[in-house]
Structure formats: structure tokens, C-alpha cells
């Protein structure tokens, strides 16, 4: 019996935009073969076998729903603004910004070849690959993007780095009035000793991780204006949080500590 890789079969049968998109659908558990969920892209599929996709998400990444939740919760204007998507990856956050009327989005990531083509082809998107945001300055970002002006909205979903290391460079490329909507990932804030099997299980460590980010931002002139739990868990099931920083709308982190405790269960 001839067989085809599942990711290739999903794309060939018109159930995904591309093989890359198919692989993501498979990894996220949306694809079934003869009614059984399969999460391995290389799984062999015969021509006579049924392949279906459940609950197809129109967003290029599930992370898009994290930003949607934040923008629904916080009174942050997207329409008409120049935005930076820090750690754009496949472009889920960028996609949300485009849908909400951003005039231009600089989609920056340290990696290469990750941005979904459906996002990258939008004329409002400026893709910046191989860009380490930890060392961003107005000059380096302008040189890499060709956009010679400060952004007035920053969103971020960064992995394998503490937000404390990138807050200052992110602030440097933004206007004083800019809004910052950032995803706090405790698994990258607490250090290796606080992570077991990829998960931050200690609620006090989660609370410390969130509070430390709030204080780090405040020390750089960014008070906290909003804070919510992410509606979707992160990798390995980690609980994550979304914060809104704004110089005019925000307040001292001490006013948010009860909220931190409530959210993290500490």
C-alpha cells in the first residue's frame, strides 16, 4: 500500500495552506486519521484513509488568542499605530495587530524562516529576521527594518530569555506614550532551579516571576496599567500572564500585588 506523510497529505487534500501549516495543525492535535488524533507529521497515510481537521483555527498560531485576550481586557488602541511584535515567530501576534488596524507592524525575531507566508506577504508587515532584541536600539532597529521612527505599540511573546533583559531595549525603540502588552512566562523568569519537567509548579515562584517583571518595568519608568492570566497555557502547560505597561495609565506595582497573588494562586 502506498503511503504519504501526514503533513503532506493534509496539505495535498486542501486541509491546510501549506505543509508547514499542516505540521502545526498536526502538532496542536487538530488532525485525525480514520477518526484517531495523530500528532506526528511523519505518520504514514494511505490514499484510502480518512484525514480530517477538527476546529481549524484561522490564526497562524494559538498564541494569537493570548494577545486577543489582552486587547479585549485592556483599553489599548491598535488602529493607526506603528507596532513592534517582539519575538514574532510565526506571526500570531502580528496577525491580531493587522486585524485590529495597525498601520504597520515590525515583526522581529532572532530566528529565521518562521513567519507564516500568509502574514509576511501583507504589505503592512516588515519582517526582521535574525534580530536579537536584547541589543535593540533605535538605530539598529531602523537599520534592520528600514522604518526610521519610534514605535508607539510594543507586543511581545519571547522565549528563553527573561523580560528583565529586554525591557530597556524595547523602551528605547518606543515613543514615551507607547503601550506595552507583554506576555510574562514564569518558566523563563525563575531560573532552572524553579522549573521541574519544564513547568513552574511552585505558585510562590510564579508570583515572584510576575512581580519581578512589574518592578523591573517600573524601575525603567513603566508603571503597570493592567494584568490578566493568559487564557491559554504555554509550553508544557505553564501558566502565563499578560501585562500592560503605560507611563500615563499605570501605577506602582505595590497596587498590583494582590492581583498577582490572586492570579498565581500564591
PLM regions: where:
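Flexible, glycine-/basic-rich loop-and-beta segments that form/coincide
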Residues: 239, 245-266
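Residues at the N-terminus of the alpha-helix immediately C-terminal to the conserved SAM/SAH-binding loop
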Residues: 89-94, 111
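Short, glycine-/aromatic-enriched active-site segment of Class I SAM-dependent methyltransferases
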Residues: 186-202
